[in-house]
């Protein structure tokens, strides 16, 4: 079990980014499994948007990390963090990480995982702790429905309600970039 919020966050993000790139067959924890499931649902629902983000990585981890910081600042400026916005930020960063990996930048995904973990644990750590940390994430995304079909539908609605403004902010930032 990780010793700190930053360490736990880094491990979860590294697992998700590896999974997103086709590796990491089994999730190392229930939290990692929930993150994968919720992220896959958001990415499926907003596939065209996230696909349009991939070219923004530009095969350079520093540029991708700078873009991540801009997007995080924009989300914060547009009303702060919530679980949906956090998830949208993770999926957005996972898209950049996968694009870097596909372009041959092996250190890109781990650098982005470290940058996002630092942002979430250091700049948003108080918010995360107030909302139950990653256990709170699992409670938020895992509480919807008991049947798989019902759960997926309700999960989709919950994600989109919580992430809607975050995705709009991401899209705005990317258009004006």
From Swiss-Prot:
One Gene Ontology cellular component: mitochondrial outer membrane
Entry keywords, A to Z: Apoptosis, Cell membrane, Membrane, Transmembrane, Transmembrane helix
Record motif BH2, residues: 126-141
Biological processes per GO annotation: extrinsic apoptotic signaling pathway in absence of ligand; intrinsic apoptotic signaling pathway in response to DNA damage; positive regulation of apoptotic process; release of cytochrome c from mitochondria
Membrane-crossing segments per the record: 86-106, 156-176
Family affiliation: Belongs to the Bcl-2 family.
Subunit structure: Interacts with BAX.
Cited function: Shows anti-apoptotic properties. Counteract the pro-apoptotic activity of BAX.
Name the record gives this protein: Anti-apoptotic protein NR13
Origin organism lineage: Eukaryota, Metazoa, Chordata, Craniata, Vertebrata
Gene name linked to the record: NR13
